[in-house]
Amino acid sequence: TTAGAAAMVNNFPAQDAFIVEKLKAKGALILGKVNMSEWAYYFCQGCPVGYSALGGQTLNPYGRRIFETGGSSSGSGVAVAANYAVAAIGSETSGSILSPSGKNSVVGLKPTIGALSRSGIVPISSSLDTAGPMTKNVIDNAILMSALIGEDKRDRYSYQASPIRFDHLDTVSLKGKRLGLNSKFQKDSLMQRAVTAMKSKGADVISFDPPEIQMYP
């Protein structure tokens, strides 16, 4: 409701966001709100990742002031990684769920646009914004995602997504699956162990060097 900005400190919405209503209806306990990169990092260029005027600097629990938190859903990733909560909600326009999930070793999912309602979320792009679940493992992520889906008439992109299937989560095979691996991550010992494990299950892991992306001036 504030996007971490002092300008929004007195922004008190009249009703819960649709996804919060869904969680409460299913018995979830809402522990609170967490910090984020101010204005989802879009209107605060040059600000440290994970910093906001209202919340200060979010720190990575695996190495405070050593490792970045990722952003903009910095607090969501940190809260799950530090076991403050079993699950958290992030939002993403471009990388804001996936980045803090990777930096804090949690599971993050950016759903298809419209699968989750965006009502109540400070908007950046109507065609790119979405909320998404952030958890410690895939099963918890699927459970949270299942609780969040539903059509919201307040969001014109919203639709009734198909139910999440749980019956095959423990039987999915990696045999024959082709997975891309950014070559710059290959030196990391944990990544090497993960790659070895995936290959042992039949995955074809293909190393690649991604091209540099020319940023806007």
Language-model segment annotations:
Residues T1-T2, Y41-G46, L98-K103, G120-I121, ...:
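Short acidic, glycine/serine/threonine-rich loops at helix termini
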Residues A203-P217:
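Short connector loops at secondary-structure junctions
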